[in-house]
Amino acid sequence: MLINGTVVALILAMMLVLIQDLRRDSVVMEAITLPKVLINRGFTPVGTSHWLNHHVLAISDLAATTKSQNSFQDQDSEIEIDVPGAGISLRSISKALRAVLGIKQTRVAGEIICTDDICSDANMEMRLRVYDKEGIKIIPVGTFGDVLAANLNDDDLDLYFETAALKLFEYLDPYIAAAYLFQTKKSGGRERAVNMVKANHPDRAWAANLIGLMDMRNEEFESSDYWLERAIEFSENDDIAGFARPIATFGYSLHRRHLWDEALEKYDIAIKVDPTYPNVYFLKGLTLFRMKKFLQAKNEFQTSSEIDPASVRSFHMWARSAAALGSKKEAEKMFQKTAAMKQVDMQLYPQWYNFREGLGENGDDIMKSWEINLGIVAKDLLPEECMPLLVLMARFAKFNQKCDWPYYQGELLEHKEFCESEMLNEKSAP
């Protein structure tokens, strides 16, 4: 009975794992075949595949989208369970069932080949092979010389593998490539998104929304309105349920033109379309904050943070709203909560400093209470960080002898014009 129970438990466990595997829209990254010259230099087929997958996952992450995506995994990370005495495994069962049921599982393999007789660095080329329901697709990445114009080293190879990963996304999911280029401020994102719309890609609503967002940020509002309206139209025609993003983005575009009431109308429509979309509550809160309706704004930021507890900006604006209402304890609690989160808004400490100073606290005492926090911020301070944080860091450096006061003083002078222009832009936006 014990043996039978164990067998039943094993079968049930395998069935659960199998069901989960079949439900995943997964892409398996297989080994990349290499020429001997690279193997002799320490490269391996599996390691090369891992390197490519690392950049695939990085692009997917930096695209910062909630759109459904493929799940990428290395071949050697696939779950493999052998059935004793049966000569079969979970992987083989999964493959067979996918074939019978017509369930897609994309596999990516490839090779690096030599395009000249001596197999020089510049003339090696990666070619990816994608196996999916459409058949086999060959994706040439280009030679190392074409992409890099440099010898092989880790930094150059990272750029090459990023290029390879982008080309893979252009075939598998072009929206991710476009969003990644937009989020990382690289060229080519708009062109890819426009091509998706022209091709009537299934994600054309997402692409049109992205174009509208790009144009809004460039203050090209007429073009932005056009693309956001198309995104809304596409989502309706393509039956994309709960696609509130272009409506919310349209609302924020109106906000940036100081059309507060019209913006609020758009946000309310977006909330009806998708009441679980946290960004629309945050954007509505920003508009209410600019209208000095601080209590209503605070409620929106609170709702946004409840839906998305990792939203640093929601807690930050909750703190600012509470401070504007004179709710000192609540504001201090929210400032502290925001500071404890991993990604801190650059404006947090200057605003928190002003809040505490406004309560009558001594500036040196405030600095002392933040010594550890500001030390961490100082360590990661970038030259392009703007005036409010630089000013505060300069105060901290003067207060704390461990910090390099001349350095921050120099940073203030060097970036004064840039930071003042950025602050001017901040005044025209929330």
Where are the predicted features?
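C-terminal/domain-edge helix-coil "capping" segments
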Residues: 1-22, 117-120, 131-214, 218-226, ...
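Short beta-strand->alpha-helix linker/helix-N-cap micro-motif
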Residues: 22-121, 133
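Helix-start (N-cap) detector for alpha-helical repeat units in TPR-like alpha-solenoids
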Residues: 171, 204-205, 238-245, 278-279, ...
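Residue-level recognition of tetratricopeptide repeat
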Residues: 179, 213, 252, 286, ...
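Single-residue signature of alpha-solenoid repeat helices
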Residues: 190-193, 224, 263, 297, ...
